[in-house]
From Swiss-Prot:
Protein residues bound to substrate: 91
Name by which UniProt lists this protein: Acetate kinase
Taxonomic source organism: Shewanella frigidimarina (strain NCIMB 400)
Catalytic activity: acetate + ATP = acetyl phosphate + ADP
SUPFAM superfamilies cross-referenced by the UniProt entry: Actin-like ATPase domain (SSF53067)
CC cofactor: Mg(2+); Mn(2+)
Predominant location: cytoplasm
EC annotation from Swiss-Prot or TrEMBL: 2.7.2.1
Similarity annotation: Belongs to the acetokinase family.
Keyword Cytoplasm among UniProt keywords: yes
Length: 400
């Protein structure tokens, strides 16, 4: 029986990953994914004791229903496991400048997360649903919030300050924050092991690619630049987010086309990206199927996605000085050999040479180098944000 079990809830914009993890060993006792929120085939899958399970959540369900299913179905069937849980850990995308490290959840912390919701409109509200559901279901357990933005507090000013009047930062904290920090912590640690280096001596570029996507330059184990900005909207092309664009487009939409600001916000966050370009889907699996079938919109969306990603990776060699490896992670990064190949081919100036067999083998949880011997290194590492969250949760409640 472990005294370090943590229930981790990781509420994404269109999915919810959950796990009961031994914070010391990283072993999953239960792990699962609820996905396709807002669609007709919303579902939940989980593993327990070697067995795989799946259930439908119902059409157009989302985070709240997924949390209720975990509590009322999965944990209710295994009360002995539920009794061993020492804390609930929550991944929080945006903590602004208020939260620079993980914290135990209090009413003040909940309010702080809510105050940052405008900076992560697809995520922080979902996190709050998870926190409130967990507080109701586990009133006696400490709850811990782990912030994606905390890892990026090591960025220098030249990386996080926008070219706006400085008083906007000084008075209103408008700056680059970055996300996916919890994933970056794990990836850097695991990449260092593969490379035979200490984390503090490791220089990598991490491409975390999912429905939300970002690139981070990590020098000597610390974040020095990242593609997401004040909010998760900046940077790469994503599932429904536009990423970088000329800010004057917003003025044009409002003044010339009659959009309201709320409509523009919805357009840029929920109707753009892969979905907007392809006019097909925000799901990269569907985009790849369309690409293989010759669908014009899907092909264009995939090409723009890969081109933008390759440009960011190339630019992030600037702050590193030395590049030990490019790491692909996240749902797309871990499973799309097509996107990895296209991106590395676009980086031909750096002499990356993809090993077709290794690249195709690195899918469905398989980790490994995907480039040829003698080539600069690119590898796939499945992320494990949940383990990092569990570790922080146990550290905090032990230190109380």
């Amino acid at each position: 029986m472990s005294d370090k079990l943590v229930l981790v809830l990781n509420c994404g914009s269109s999915s919810l990953k959950f796990a009961i993890i031994d914070a010391q060993s990283g072993d999953d006792k239960v792990s699962g994914l609820a996905e396709c929120f807002g669609l007709e085939d919303s579902r939940i899958k989980w593993k327990f004791d070697g067995g795989k399970n799946e259930a439908k959540l119902g059409a157009f369900t989302a985070h709240r229903e997924a949390v209720e299913f975990i509590v009322n179905n999965i944990l209710a069937e295994h009360p002995e496991l539920a009794a061993q849980i020492k804390a609930v850990g929550h991944r929080i995308v945006h903590g602004g400048e208020k939260f620079t490290r993980s914290v135990i959840v209090t009413p003040e912390v909940i309010q702080g997360i809510e105050d940052c919701a405008s900076l992560a409109p697809l995520h922080n509200p979902a996190h709050l649903i998870g926190i409130r559901a967990a507080l109701a279901s586990f009133p006696a357990l400490p709850q811990v919030a782990v912030f994606d933005t905390a890892f990026h507090q090591t960025m220098p000013e030249k990386a996080y300050i926008y070219a706006l009047p400085y008083k906007l930062y000084r008075e209103h904290s408008i700056r680059r924050y970055g996300m996916h920090g919890t994933s970056n912590i794990y990836i850097c640690r695991e990449a260092a092991k593969v490379l035979g280096k200490e984390t503090k001596d490791t220089n990598i570029i991490c491409a975390h690619l999912g429905n939300g996507a970002s690139v981070t330059a990590i020098k000597d184990g610390k974040s020095v630049d990242t593609s997401m900005g004040l909010t998760p909207l900046e940077g790469l092309v994503m599932g429904t987010r536009c990423g970088d664009l000329d800010p004057s487009i917003i003025f044009h939409l409002v003044k010339q086309l009659g959009y309201t600001l709320d409509e523009v916000n919805n357009l840029l966050n929920k109707q753009s990206g892969l979905l907007g370009i392809s006019e097909l889907t925000n799901d990269c699996r569907g985009i790849e199927e369309g690409y293989q079938d010759g669908h014009k919109g899907a092909t264009l969306a995939l090409d723009i996605f890969c081109y933008r990603l390759a440009k960011y990776i190339a630019s992030y060699t600037v702050p590193l000085g030395r590049l030990d490896a490019i790491i692909f992670t996240g749902g797309i990064g871990e499973n799309s050999d097509l996107i990895r190949e296209k991106v590395l081919n676009l980086l031909a100036i750096f002499n990356f040479k993809v090993d077709d067999n290794l690249n195709k083998a690195a899918r469905f949880g398989q980790q490994g180098i995907i480039t040829q011997v003698g080539s600069p290194i690119a590898m796939v590492i499945p992320t494990n944000e949940e383990w990092v969250i569990a570790e922080d949760a146990i550290k905090l409640i032990t230190a109380k």
